[in-house]
A protein has these predicted regions:
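C-terminal accessory/interaction regions of large nucleic acid-associated machines
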Residues: 704-713, 717-902
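Often metal-dependent polyanion-binding catalytic scaffolds in large enzymes
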Residues: 1-436, 454, 513, 606, ...
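Hydrophobic cores of alpha-helical transmembrane segments in multi-pass integral membrane proteins
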Residues: 25, 578-588, 749, 825-831
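Active-site cores of enzymes that catalyze phosphoryl transfer or operate on phosphate-rich substrates
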Residues: 342, 397-492, 496, 500-506, ...
Length: 902
């Protein structure tokens, strides 16, 4: 297995892949005998020559398992080599072309000097935006990375070894790890519990704290200083969020107890890494008062610490008597340990002995910094100490801020019971809004003691949030997200229940959390401005927003709108929703924080992060932005420290640019109107074609028969079920993730492109060819949209899809593939006409070739999957467990080859 599946013109990369392939071949011979390696090569050759299906059909189940494991393992190894290569290339690019942040600040500096009319800038404005900036990637569990943590750990070890060429034992250690990888089961034995998922996220957060964020925030401050803008030492331009343990929408496994347990786990990790950081500071800060002084404030603070911490080790008092910074660092370590113990036992906070919140910890650290700055210690203060302060400001003593999400129906179910209002559920959105806002304004409390189980579970969540904020501070949980928000009343319903739990009270001028509507379907997106207008024009709710610092968060869902309307309409309606939300927020003097619920695949809003952020409507990134980092992409983005740094830095840089350089329209009103009209035509025609496909009564039967989606649940990818609870069968009950998953596995990838060709054709035939070309060159939104569609088309393989259909789908349903093929051909033709290329990715030859060669290795797995799916279905309930295992392994293999699940 020595041929590289990577076509990049880079000797080091090709060498690494060849080397890992050779090691895998040796492992196969060592572990299973030469017959397996011979079979791998025979199948690879046969597939290339078009006769692979015949050979695969004759394989035993056991041989099928071994074969798919071999190909899947090869993809895992190739992916690692690619990651290491990307890290090398990025390191070189940083040296030759500067970092993402450096380039962003260069563009801001150029804008400062240019002072273009209508886009004038001042350093004071920039300083204000930077001081209030908040960029927050939010980790979610679903869709879960298909590979187990045990597999990812082995792959991480291989990456470390590849990155250490001077290690004399490198070859032996690589061989050892590949053997370990082969002997590790790729499949989970059971569905992960929510706390298992939380631990997985904490694995990455720990590494970000220790390896990535200190350097990124240090660089951010340095780059801004280059244009005379100071980033306040305790500013929080970057922080992290977490849904794991808080997202209960459709996941019955998330209870108030699970949320509490997840937060406790998170905080324990945060304190552990913070103590380690303080120990590093303690070791370094050997500054002696025999040589330089210390401020009276620092000395008094140390004295107070010694008074309140009688357990302070005498050894440190003796050895560090003239080293106040070490004494202060030791006191901080002690207070952090007491904080950890307080959380573990539930004991009350003791002032000056443990920390009530992050602000108290930062105050101690700033005291040390100020003292150093006052006593010839500027380089020391702005070195490790400043990096530590900025990092702790980013993570806090909670590591990440947890969001809580629940479906809007859950809140109305509670209110129906506790208010006793006849026909409450049947009332209109406006009627409910009027009733509920009066309850809010009057601070009405209800008796919730007689609630049924589901209602009690919902109320218990709000009680738990209140308790967690009491225990862990205001940064523990900041936002409650209401999914399926169809009207303003859906959000207010959650606020009224929060009022019952003591989280909100207008009489007490208290709002301990904020509330965010999640707009997911096309109808909700189109109503976005109207919903926000109704909320902000209401005095009671506007008071809540004022109590939250005049910031209103709105979450946009990319997945459901795509499943509902197709990619063109989904992307366009999300773009339009952002414009209307921006305008309403500006009207009411509110800072808008948009939370982008983007997935890993293009069909769920995925794509290059930098381009996506730059393509957002002007003024919609007002220094505040959140975006999901979904389970399937976290490993690819954060597994290596260098790649984690790249991802965090480009996200911060793009958000900085979008905030400062995209505050007003770049085009005239007439131009924007013409583009909008043209895009509306593309969207309408695309929507019509997409709906014509998915509304056909037999489409669900085609989808389920031509894809392995029904096996998704057996992979135990996450704690959340793949279907919505209490929903009927068919496509409506299917979540967007398995919808994309199924189409992707069978290489039809309908959610990523279907309908776009019809939309572009309609615009072209309406005489808009020149306008489309202008949009492609000058409109970031349209450029990014077309680029993402082109990438998905390149990954689509309808010749392989035909194998699925001919083998697995009843003949009377084959016409669906004909429809998909026709739209595919049209979309490719329209994209090539628009871009002027002769082939997909024609301007990215290396990437195109990489995908082409990967397909040569993916094809055997696909053909095996088709064969195994047929055998499993033919066997029905009596299917051999080994046969089912072989099938599940093919699903993992395709996910590894395509680098996403759904």
């Amino acid at each position: 297995m020595s041929q590289s599946p990577i076509a990049a013109d880079d000797a080091a990369l090709r060498s690494d892949v060849r080397r890992l392939g050779d090691l895998l071949g040796q492992t196969l011979v060592r572990q299973e005998g030469p017959e397996l390696l011979a079979l791998v090569e025979e199948v690879r050759k046969a597939v290339r020559e078009g006769s692979g299906a015949e050979i695969l059909a004759q394989l035993s189940v056991e041989d099928s398992v071994q074969l798919v494991r071999a190909f899947s393992t090869y993809f895992h190894l190739a992916n690692v080599a690619e990651q290491v290569h990307r890290a090398r290339v990025l390191a070189e690019a940083r040296v030759t072309g500067g970092s993402w942040l450096a380039r962003a600040v260069d563009r801001i500096d150029a804008a400062l000097k240019a002072q273009t009319p209508g886009h004038e800038l001042t350093k004071e404005e920039i300083a204000e935006w930077v001081g209030a900036m908040s960029v927050r990637p939010v980790f979610t569990a679903h869709p879960t990375e298909a590979a187990r943590r045990s597999v990812l750990n082995k792959l991480g070890s291989i990456a470390d070894l590849l990155d250490d060429p001077r290690n004399p034992s490198q070859q032996e250690r690589l061989a050892e790890t590949v053997d370990l990888l082969w002997q590790t089961d790729e499949l989970r034995l059971g569905r992960p519990e929510p706390l298992d998922e939380a631990l997985n996220a904490l694995y990455y957060l720990d590494d970000l704290f220790t390896q990535t964020v200190p350097e990124v925030l240090n660089d951010f401050a340095k780059e801004m200083k280059r244009i005379d803008v100071e980033v306040p030492i305790t500013a929080r331009p970057l922080s992290f969020g977490n849904w794991i343990g808080g997202d209960r929408d459709g996941n019955p496994n998330i209870t108030a107890e699970v949320t509490t347990d997840a937060m406790e786990l998170q905080v324990s990790h945060a304190i552990r890494v913070t103590i380690a950081a303080m120990n590093a500071l303690r070791q370094m800060l050997s500054v002696s008062t025999k040589i330089v002084g210390a401020t009276p404030e620092l000395s008094a603070s140390v004295e107070k610490d010694l008074k309140h911490i009688p357990e302070f080790e005498q050894r440190f008092l003796r050895l560090n008597a003239e080293e106040p910074y070490r004494l202060k660092a030791t006191a901080i370590v002690n207070r952090l340990a007491f904080t950890r113990d307080r959380h573990a036992t539930g004991a009350p906070h003791v002032p000056n002995r443990d920390y009530a919140n992050t602000a108290e910890l930062l105050a101690d650290l700033v005291l040390m910094r100020d003292s150093l700055l006052a006593h010839r210690g500027e380089l020391i203060a702005t070195g490790l100490l400043e990096r530590t302060i900025r990092t702790i400001a980013a993570f806090g003593i909670n590591h990440a801020t947890m969001d809580v999400r629940e479906h809007s129906d859950a809140h109305h179910n509670v209110l129906k019971q506790i208010t006793g209002i006849d026909g409450y559920i049947e009332k209109s959105h406006d009627e409910k809004f009027e009733i509920l806002t009066k309850f809010l304004a009057d601070d009405v409390r209800f008796d919730a003691s007689q609630l049924e189980a589901l209602g009690k579970k919902t109320v218990d969540t709000f009680v738990a949030i209140n308790n967690l904020i009491d225990r862990f501070g205001p940064e523990a949980i900041e936002t409650y997200i209401v999914s399926m928000t169809k009207g303003a009343d859906d959000l207010i319903a959650a606020v009224v229940i929060a009022q019952q739990a003591g989280l909100v009270s207008l009489k007490e001028k208290k709002a301990r959390i904020g509330f965010a509507p999640l707009l997911e379907t096309v109808a909700e997106l189109r109503a976005a401005g109207e919903i926000l207008e109704k909320l902000l024009s209401n005095a009671a709710y506007r008071s809540i927003v004022a109590l939250r610092g005049d910031v209103q968060e709105v979450m946009l869902g990319y997945s459901d709108s795509n499943k509902d309307a197709g990619i063109a309409t989904s992307q366009w309606e999300i773009h339009r929703a952002q414009r209307s939300l921006r305008d309403v927020a500006m009207k009411y003097g509110v800072k808008l924080c948009l939370f982008h619920g983007r997935g890993g695949s293009v069909g769920r809003g995925g794509g290059p992060t930098y381009e996506a952020l730059i393509a957002l409507p002007w003024g919609s990134v007002d220094g505040q932005i959140k975006m999901t980092e979904q389970g399937e992409v976290i490993s690819d983005k954060y597994a290596l420290a260098s790649l984690a740094r790249e991802n965090v830095e480009l996200t911060l840089a793009a958000s900085l640019e979008a905030t400062i350089l995209n505050r007003g329209p770049r085009q005239s009103k007439e131009e924007l109107a013409a583009w909008g009209d043209c895009m509306q035509l593309v969207s309408d025609s695309s929507f019509k074609r997409y709906r014509a496909l998915i509304q056909q009564p037999d489409l669900p039967a085609y989808f389920y028969s031509s894809t392995p989606v029904e096996q998704l649940g057996e992979l135990f990818l996450g704690s959340r079920p793949s279907r919505r609870p209490d929903a009927a069968g068919g496509l409506d009950s299917l979540r967007a993730i398995p919808w994309v998953f199924g189409w992707t596995q069978s290489r039809q990838i309908v959610p990523g492109w279907f309908g776009v060709g019809s939309g572009l054709k309609a615009a072209r035939e309406a005489g808009h060819s020149a306008l489309l070309e202008q949009m492609l060159k000058e409109w970031h939104f349209f450029t990014t949209f077309i680029s993402n569609v082109e990438m998905t088309l390149a990954k689509t393989d309808l010749a392989l899809a035909k194998r699925y259909v001919e083998t697995l789908v009843p003949a009377e349903l084959h016409h669906f593939l004909d429809e998909i093929q026709a739209e595919f051909d049209l979309t490719v033709s329209e994209i090539l006409t628009l871009t002027g290329k002769t082939s997909l990715l024609g301007d990215q030859e290396i990437l195109a070739r990489t995908l082409q060669v990967r397909d040569a290795y993916l094809s055997p797995i696909h053909l095996l999957q088709v064969n195994l799916l047929k055998r499993v279905r033919d066997a029905g309930d009596s299917a051999d467990p080994v046969l089912r295992r072989a099938l599940l392994l093919t699903i993992n293999g395709v996910a590894a080859g395509l680098r996403n699940t759904g």
